């Protein structure tokens, strides 16, 4: 989406070619600013993992794109930035690698010495009783997140929900704001797994170019812990694209989005 859009800006430049875009303006729930959705890209994939010998592969089953791609014809620089921004975040790691920097995880081994934690309340998240904690860096000048943790109020201390924000004052190049929201569910076998991973970032690549808001929404489902066919790990490359990934039907995408 184009970020911080004004009615006046829609009368200028490239916007004149797409007058219908005026009706597409909406308010961003993350920033409360006006944004103009330009492009939607979807990917459906399956990830397989083997611990010994260690191997991980992602099989892309479907890809879909809708929108006005002309707005994003800014060369490889934007693509490089987005790949760096939208790295996978695992809060159970001690360190989170993001934007070519190292951030201390709010539940990592070094979290107590790096963050200040405040006990807010006991709340219900879905059907789970959770302790609500907020956290901020001990030193405001340090590279760190601010956010909220919702931890189960029982002996497991499992994380039910985590929200994190990277403020503008952190000084990361191109990034005006970054928000992460992750939610976890318990499987029938007792394991807690990530099910929802939303990341929203406001970018200002160049001062003379319209700011951009990019949102990545990831849904994880169908966790299976049964043995995997060895032949799948013999496929070449870490990312395998199925031959018909660009020709999936509307019915396929309707099922995937549920």
Model-derived features with residue positions:
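Short aromatic loop motif centered on NTY/YTY
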Residues: 165-167, 172-216
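Structured extracytoplasmic
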Residues: 1-132, 136-144, 202, 207-208, ...
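Feature captures eukaryotic membrane-trafficking machinery centered on endolysosomal pathways
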Residues: 114-186
